[in-house]
């Protein structure tokens, strides 16, 4: 098996960029400036006109590409750390490891990155994206169009499914909202799955029963009934592999995980891996990928990508709405120079009631991030 190397894209001769492509295959890398050649492990392979240099020049010191200080892997997720003395990745991930386990264990043989990705700029401070990712209150207002669309698709899908003899009784929503909320809470408690909680080290997550179906082991009437047998079979295999309780948590619940400070993993319409880096105080670069089980059939992969792009894609119902909301907030801050207030994230500080989160939402997960951020600034 090969090895993974992460190297600074910096020629050790005169600082040129050694690799100018975002992705691809190569056995060696040649700096375009003076033609120095390096191997995929970073080792120096060739110096043009080496005879012009002093004797022993190549061996005076390591002139290969420089590796990052720390590179660690947890279940196929690779993390770079620029602090050589920092705690181990295993310890840093803390409670987030359980969520990564649940994602990876959706496959019997491992997950793979689906070719392609999305890179886009957002004209706002990067921390606003973090807030938005854990915000329960914006969903039905910002994404109202998506819910209207989903209701129409579900109605048509149920009619088609029933006409083909597939029961959709489990997806009827005649019960009152209060009964539905209580059922949702009870379902979480039945699987010992918390709604929202601190995972340690600034990481956080929240879970909720999926209402839209999942392209892994949970069919939904908004999809063609031909997908149901294979999705049901996937669920049965998952139960046999990890047990009924964990299978239900993995397959029937959506999960949002934020790993401090700037990694988001959203497991709902598909599995989205997203990073967001500050370019300047009012500008960030967002990068997104999706992963899927290696053994997934072509039909289910097609369904997965449709589901993913429908909401999470760059032209989907979700991402453009979120970008507009975040950028509008940033414009508001900039325009109100006399405003000395703070972003209010006090929801959830009301007297504790197990049903409060289900009824109203909770901004506690945002406070987890800001508490850790304040700790870093203080130190």
Go through the PLM ranges and name each one.
Residues 1-98:
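Rieske [2Fe-2S] iron-sulfur-binding domain
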Residues 69-379:
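C-terminal catalytic domain of Rieske-type non-heme iron oxygenases
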């Amino acid at each position: 098996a090969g090895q993974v190397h992460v190297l600074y894209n910096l020629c050790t001769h005169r600082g040129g960029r050694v690799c100018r492509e975002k992705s691809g295959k190569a056995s060696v890398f040649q700096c375009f400036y003076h033609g120095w050649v390096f191997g995929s492990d970073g080792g120096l392979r060739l110096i043009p006109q080496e005879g012009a240099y002093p004797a022993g020049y190549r061996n005076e010191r390591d002139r290969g590409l420089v590796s990052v200080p720390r590179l660690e892997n947890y279940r196929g997720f690779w993390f770079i750390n620029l602090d050589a003395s920092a705690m181990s990745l295993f310890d840093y991930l803390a409670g987030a490891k359980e969520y990564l386990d649940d994602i990876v264990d959706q496959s019997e043989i491992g997950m793979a990155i689906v070719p392609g990705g999305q890179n886009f700029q957002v004209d706002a401070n990067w921390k606003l994206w973090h807030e938005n990712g854990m915000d329960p209150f914006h969903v039905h207002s910002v994404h109202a169009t998506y819910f209207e669309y989903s209701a129409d698709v579900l109605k048509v899908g149920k009619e088609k499914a029933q006409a083909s003899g597939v029961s959709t009784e489990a997806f009827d929503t005649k019960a009152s909202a209060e009964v539905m909320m209580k059922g949702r809470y009870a379902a979480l408690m039945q699987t010992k799955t918390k709604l929202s909680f601190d995972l340690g080290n600034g990481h956080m997550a929240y879970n909720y029963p999926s209402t839209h179906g999942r392209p892994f082991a949970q069919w939904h009437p908004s999809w063609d009934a031909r997908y149901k047998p294979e999705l049901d079979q996937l669920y049965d295999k998952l139960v046999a592999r990890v047990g009924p309780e964990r299978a239900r948590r993995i397959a029937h619940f959506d999960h949002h995980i934020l790993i401090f400070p700037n990694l988001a993993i959203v497991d709902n319409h598909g599995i989205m891996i997203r990073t967001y880096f500050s370019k300047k105080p009012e500008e960030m670069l967002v990068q997104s990928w999706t992963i899927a089980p290696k053994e997934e059939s072509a039909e289910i992969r097609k369904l997965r990508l449709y589901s993913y792009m429908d909401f999470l894609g760059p032209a989907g119902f979700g991402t453009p709405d979120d970008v507009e909301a975040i950028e509008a907030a940033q414009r508001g801050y900039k325009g109100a120079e006399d405003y000395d207030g703070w972003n209010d994230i006090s929801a959830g500080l009301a007297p504790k009631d197990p049903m409060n989160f289900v009824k109203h939402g909770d901004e506690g997960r945002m406070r987890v991030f800001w508490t850790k951020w304040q700790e870093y600034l203080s130190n």
